[in-house]
């Protein structure tokens, strides 16, 4: 990868994780809408937003090329399921007062990326990376052993998003085209659920206030912009390097949860957070040291 691609990847990764970090504030505005309904709106409006974006950027030629590779289309169905599950779990967590555990999941995620990069992409661990991963595992095990609880939400978010990033990197599909196909795979299920199954006070857009409908439509922008930045960054950076930036999003989530939404971390969560934070500190220092050494 050349220096220009790396710089682009860094900027795209920073943008993606900053937007994700403050995204819970958006979902809190529509907390009274069921999580499954919000998910359907994310899918539907993301699809139409991508159609408009593809038209403006005149990138339909990429789609024509992609259609000629059925294997990649199938793999995008896999990535669509992974990201759809991640979206649903995240929305539910934020709107059911589990924002802290959601942030924990994205603190764990960079370390999961390191493991997946080693297993599936042949990326080698350095000693300090091994130490960081072991500390993260210890944090989860201590919570399980001492407090009898397991951060299911955190682990679900961490692994679903890590595997999503891995699949997208293996496919190496242009970001916008890949996002369009992913939402296209999810669109029929989302449309059937919203228009034929969902029956809540907010499921009928014709009866909703205009402000609510605008917020629901905005789910397409809130969803696609950071995800496009992420997938574009994933094709320009090593997966382990991409993990370096992922502390930005969960840090913002943690601060939002504690400062604005009154969530208080219990002893079990703080033990796990402590292990993860130490692991991330080691990971970051190792990355900085390695970068300085290789640049000399």
Regions found by a protein language model. Name each.
Residues 1-15, 48-76, 127, 179, ...:
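Membrane-interface interhelical linkers
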Residues 1-37, 141-170, 192, 256, ...:
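Glycine-/small-residue-enriched transmembrane alpha-helix faces in small-molecule transporters
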Residues 2, 247-296:
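C-terminal-most transmembrane helix of multi-pass membrane proteins
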Residues 18-22, 26, 77-94, 156-163, ...:
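Hydrophobic alpha-helical transmembrane segments of multi-pass membrane transport proteins
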Residues 30, 38, 93-94, 119-121, ...:
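Hydrophobic/aromatic residues within transmembrane alpha-helices
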Residues 45-49, 105-119, 189, 245-260, ...:
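Alpha-helical transmembrane segments of compact multi-pass small-molecule transporters, enriched
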Residues 104-108, 175-185, 224-259:
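Helix-helix packing/entry segments at the starts of transmembrane helices
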Residues 128-144, 157, 268-287:
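Hydrophobic transmembrane alpha-helices of multi-pass small-molecule transport proteins
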């Amino acid at each position: 990868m050349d220096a220009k691609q790396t710089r682009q990847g860094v900027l795209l990764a920073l943008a993606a994780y900053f937007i994700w970090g403050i995204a819970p504030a958006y979902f809190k505005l529509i907390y009274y809408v069921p999580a499954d309904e919000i998910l359907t709106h994310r899918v539907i409006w993301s699809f139409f937003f991508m159609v408009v974006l593809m038209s403006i950027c005149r990138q339909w030629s990429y789609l024509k090329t992609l259609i000629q590779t059925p294997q990649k289309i199938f793999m995008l169905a896999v990535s669509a399921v992974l990201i759809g599950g991640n979206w649903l779990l995240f929305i539910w967590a934020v709107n059911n007062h589990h924002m802290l555990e959601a942030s924990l999941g994205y603190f764990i995620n960079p370390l999961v990326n390191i493991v997946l990069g080693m297993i599936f992409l042949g990326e080698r661990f350095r000693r300090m990376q091994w130490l960081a991963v072991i500390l993260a595992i210890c944090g989860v095990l201590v919570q399980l052993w001492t407090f009898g609880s397991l951060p299911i939400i955190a682990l679900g978010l961490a692994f679903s998003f890590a595997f999503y990033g891995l699949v997208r990197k293996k496919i190496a599909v242009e970001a916008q085209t890949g996002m369009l196909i992913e939402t296209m795979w999810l669109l029929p299920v989302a449309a059937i659920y919203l228009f034929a199954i969902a029956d809540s006070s907010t499921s009928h857009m014709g009866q909703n206030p205009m402000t609510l409908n605008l917020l629901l439509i905005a789910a397409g922008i809130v969803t696609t912009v950071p995800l496009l930045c992420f997938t574009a960054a994933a094709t320009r950076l090593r997966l382990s390097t991409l993990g370096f930036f992922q502390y930005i999003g969960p840090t913002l989530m943690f601060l939002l949860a504690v400062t604005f939404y009154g969530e208080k971390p219990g002893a079990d969560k703080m033990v796990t957070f402590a292990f993860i934070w130490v692991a991330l500190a080691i990971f970051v220092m190792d990355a900085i040291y390695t970068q300085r050494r290789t640049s000399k």
